[in-house]
Amino acid sequence: ALQAGDRLPLAEAARPWLRRAPDWSLAPWPWFDVSPTRVLRLLRGSHFDALDAASRTALLGEPFLIASESNRVGVRLLGPALQLSAPLELVSAAVTPGTVQLPPGGQPIMLAAEHPTTGGYPRIAHLIATDQPQLAQRRPGETVRLALVEPDEAEALRRRQAAALARLHDYVKQRRRELGCDA
């Protein structure tokens, strides 16, 4: 049986660059935050102002639990029941990942990667693109809080994320070149 301090011999590395690979790591990414309650940022949806005042306050001030019925189509949020000021008669309209719909029960649904192409519920908000990976990492039973941002802030966050990913790509490409693994 293996014991603490045992050393295991390894066969010659199949790829010579593996022997030369230095230890390195990346800092945790802010969009994969693992804090117990993550704040997800939203843009106002076309029907945000149709929410009554108490519902707008609750949407942005109360925590929401990710429901066990969540999947890759939509993430169901459980929290205070949200209500419209008056009923809306809507025709189906295009939706995208991150669209926050409000079905009749008052519990919002954030559309995810395998969302339908159209939806007929009020579109009260839209999760910004930068926070969509964070939503995808949340599990049923975890909580999220929601906050509104302006479009210019959402765009600045998207640009910052894109720049960070470009730097990572360049760094990995350079390291692979240095290690001779692109040959």
Predicted regions and their residues:
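Conserved "landmark" site that anchors the functional core of diverse proteins
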Residues: A1-A183
